[in-house]
């Protein structure tokens, strides 16, 4: 069983990352309104998570603590599936369908390009 101190360190890393991620999302959404703001943070967050995913699998440049702080904390608070869902639910059918399609396609594309970007920088294969 992990010691309470080590668990608290993890909680603090996630909390610090989450604080920074939430502030960054707020700042972006203050300047990019509505669905485009949420789409922007979700796509950017997916791109960053794709980079972390590739790094964790092949490179280990970012250690476990960095992945907790940045992946779980920062990106977890930076992106927002719930706001995307509420926005989509409150729209008429066709605009909602477009919003859902754009979010799914672009966030998956973001993960792909994040992985590809780190792969190109590291010259390793996926």
Swiss-Prot record:
GO terms for biological process: cellular detoxification of fluoride. It comes from Methanosarcina mazei (strain ATCC BAA-159 / DSM 3647 / Goe1 / Go1 / JCM 11833 / OCM 88). Fluoride-specific ion channel. Important for reducing fluoride concentration in the cell, thus reducing its toxicity. It is a multi-pass membrane protein. It is found in: Cell membrane. It catalyses: fluoride(in) = fluoride(out). One of its GO terms (cellular component) is plasma membrane. One of its GO terms (molecular function) is metal ion binding. Na(+) binds at residues 76, 79. This is Fluoride-specific ion channel FluC 2.
